């Protein structure tokens, strides 16, 4: 196999995974980065469309993996037309086992391609109560995958301890601020450009406004 270090990014076409993609490209070079996108039965096709467009636009190979069988065994607001709300400690947008599945399938693919580094955009700081976005889960999954496949994976989570404001700052540092602002999709309701009301849109816009305010203030003080 090619000895050149390569990376694969778990990629949804959203703000976080696109930021990770730019990070991977900066570190490994665009020719050595691939993305894996999952069709898991999400309510809106726009997520898959955005992911495909960005991958093509940036010139990275995209592999689409169908894990929609999960719809037959779990229920949530990400895959069904229902009101988004908090249910106990976890919002009903949480998809049981999703990130575990994503990491498992990505690892299987990565090993076949001779890739050891996997990027995922999960974040514990603004994680909305999703247990599979925690650092302890990712580290546990990394160990499990290494043991399961007798292969040394390195799961990278560059956003793990960043707030959304800091994620926007990282995008700016990577030279991708405008690109991510214009081309990524985050809305739970599938609205192009965002609905401005769902938890995901609110978190994204709050972080954006905080970063722009801080950046403007910093420029004035120079």
Curated annotation (Swiss-Prot):
InterPro entries: QueC, Rossmann-like_a/b/a_fold. One of its GO terms (molecular function) is zinc ion binding. It comes from the Bacteria. Its cofactor is Zn(2+). Its EC number is 6.3.4.20. Pathway: Purine metabolism; 7-cyano-7-deazaguanine biosynthesis. Zn(2+) binds at residues 187, 195, 198, 201. Keywords: ATP-binding, Ligase, Metal-binding, Nucleotide-binding, Queuosine biosynthesis, Zinc. The keyword Metal-binding applies. ATP binds at residues 11-21. The keyword Ligase applies. It catalyses: 7-carboxy-7-deazaguanine + NH4(+) + ATP = 7-cyano-7-deazaguanine + ADP + phosphate + H2O + H(+). Binds 1 zinc ion per subunit. CDD domains: QueC-like (cd01995). Catalyzes the ATP-dependent conversion of 7-carboxy-7-deazaguanine (CDG) to 7-cyano-7-deazaguanine (preQ(0)). Belongs to the QueC family. This is 7-cyano-7-deazaguanine synthase. It comes from Actinobacillus pleuropneumoniae serotype 3 (strain JL03). The lineage of its organism: Bacteria, Pseudomonadati, Pseudomonadota, Gammaproteobacteria, Pasteurellales.
């Amino acid at each position: 196999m090619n000895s050149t270090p390569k990376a694969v990014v778990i990629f949804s076409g959203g703000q976080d995974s696109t930021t990770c993609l730019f990070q991977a490209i900066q570190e490994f070079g665009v020719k050595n980065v691939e993305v894996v996108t999952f069709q898991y039965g999400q309510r809106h096709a726009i997520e898959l469309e955005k992911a495909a467009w960005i991958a093509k636009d940036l010139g990275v190979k995209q592999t689409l993996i169908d894990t929609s069988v999960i719809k037959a065994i779990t229920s949530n607001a990400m895959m069904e037309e229902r009101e988004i709300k908090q249910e106990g400690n976890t919002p009903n947008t949480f998809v049981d086992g999703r990130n575990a599945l994503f990491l498992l399938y990505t690892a299987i693919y990565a090993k076949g391609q001779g890739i050891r580094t996997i990027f995922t955009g999960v974040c514990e700081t603004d994680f909305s109560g999703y247990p599979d976005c925690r650092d302890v889960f990712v580290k546990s999954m990394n160990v499990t995958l290494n043991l399961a496949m007798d292969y040394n994976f390195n799961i990278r989570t560059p956003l793990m301890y960043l707030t959304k404001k800091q994620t926007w700052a990282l995008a700016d540092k990577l030279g991708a601020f405008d690109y991510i602002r214009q081309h990524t999709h985050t809305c739970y309701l599938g609205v192009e450009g965002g609905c401005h009301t769902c938890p995901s849109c609110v978190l994204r816009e709050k972080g954006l406004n905080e970063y722009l305010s801080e950046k403007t203030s910093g420029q004035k003080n120079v």
